[in-house]
Design a protein with these regions (language model features):
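Conserved alpha/beta enzyme-core scaffold
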Residues: 4-415
């Protein structure tokens, strides 16, 4: 059962403000990102500190943005995309804890937790890099502050924190950001249909963020004995669970979750789901030892060298490496594993092909098993480079783009 929140050392916001004022000038503050943003704490910090650095992964919604606030991240979310004071550190998700330990010393960790059960609160939807930061802040003698929220689901694994290990808590009753699942469009369904046949019963799945990975999950209703080992999941996992598609002897493992309120209600107190820290979920060695590891990630562009851009638009940083590179490497080494890059063949708003001769900006990932669009599956891994080009043009590219792509391939001396 639940203990009352009176087992937490609560502090009045005014007293916390006094404590924050005594911090060293321009402190570095880490807060949960994704859908676990601690809005109340961030507002309080922003009112007290004239100048600080705010580090969040995939920041969503409204976060403090003004002169004096530097935004810092290894994965840019919509909350930071237009920030004039953005410091972007290119880094795979599995290595982000290393950067925060070695290069970016943290003064304050903000947490957004559940109410306590048996003297433990839970980080709920967002574990990710937070345990690593927790340890680093402890070692430096920094501050750990939590906002304790009855609406945050109580999840298990590395999400749990003993109440005595938190310096200060404030009590909030704050709605969590939620996202209702939307039905996949025709293009996403077509792509999912091509990947479906490559996913056997008993496979372990990692799916990235976006409509296409969601559609792939939606296509797997006939599979059995599936497992989840992923940095994140959303409502598609709940739908498959309800249809009996998972091996229930093995926990569904992820590092962060976002989705609907219905998903959050299912997560609360659910021991079938195990939240693990980034260094565990995204460890390429661990991923490679998982048989039939299937990784499905999206991209903005793929070029004729099989390189993917999933992080920049017109050279400007849009997201980051994230964990896709960790899983692509791991899945390629997995016995029976596959790493798919899945994307529509045509960018509807820009009216251009997503299969391009050469990516203009930095590469997010390379060496994938296959590139999949609504037109087909291009087998990349194991093919000679000219056959890779042929596969990409004939199987993945939009028919209207193929002639120009063949011309480009000839100019590259690869056709």
């Amino acid at each position: 059962g639940r203990d009352g929140a009176d087992t937490v050392k609560t502090i009045r916001p005014e007293s916390l403000a006094n404590r924050l004022e005594s911090l060293t000038p321009n402190p570095r503050i880490v807060a949960p990102g994704n859908f676990a943003t601690p809005q109340t704490l961030l507002k309080l910090v922003d009112e007290v500190l004239p100048q600080y650095t705010l580090h969040m992964l995939n920041a969503q919604g409204t976060i403090p943005t003004r002169d004096g606030v530097t935004h810092e991240t290894t994965f840019v979310g919509p909350g930071m995309r237009r920030s004039p004071n953005l410091m972007y550190y290119p880094c795979r998700l599995s290595l982000t804890p290393v950067i925060l330990r070695q290069s970016l010393p943290v003064d304050v960790l903000l947490l957004h937790t559940s109410t306590p059960r048996d003297k433990m609160v839970s980080m709920g939807l967002e574990v990710n890099i937070l345990p690593a930061v927790f340890e680093a802040v402890r070692d430096r003698g920094g501050l750990i502050i939590a906002q304790v929220n009855p609406k945050m689901p109580h999840t298990y694994g590395d999400a749990l924190v003993h109440v005595d290990d938190i310096d200060y808590c404030i009590e909030v009753d704050e709605p969590l950001m939620a996202l209702e699942p939307s039905p996949p469009d025709e293009v996403a369904q077509a792509i999912a249909g091509r990947i479906y046949s490559r996913i056997p019963d008993g496979a372990t799945l990692q799916l990235g963020i976006g409509g296409v990975p969601d559609a792939v999950l939606g296509a797997l209703t006939g599979r059995r004995g599936l497992r989840i080992w992923s940095e994140m999941f959303s409502d598609g996992v709940l739908a498959l669970h309800e249809l009996g598609c998972f091996d229930t002897d093995v926990p569904l493992t992820a590092s962060f979750v976002f989705g609907s309120q219905r998903l959050y209600d299912w997560l609360d107190g659910n021991r079938l789901v195990r939240m693990r820290r980034t260094e565990v979920t995204n460890d390429p060695g661990r991923i490679s030892r998982t048989p039939a590891m299937i990784s499905v990630n999206s991209a903005l562009q793929v070029d004729l060298y099989g390189q993917a851009n999933a992080s920049r638009i017109k050279g400007r940083i849009y997201s980051g490496f994230g964990g896709s590179t960790d899983f692509i490497v791991g899945a390629l080494h997995s016995p029976g594993g596959n790493a798919f890059i899945a994307l529509p063949s045509w960018h509807p708003r820009a009216q251009v092909s997503t299969i391009v001769p050469l990516i203009e900006g930095p590469v997010t990932s390379f060496q994938h098993s296959s590139v999949v669009t609504e037109y087909g599956l291009a087998q990349i891994f194991g093919n000679e480079e000219r056959e890779q080009v042929r596969q990409l043009i004939e199987h993945a590219a939009h028919p209207d783009a193929r002639e120009a792509l063949w011309e480009a391939a000839k100019a590259q001396g690869r056709a």
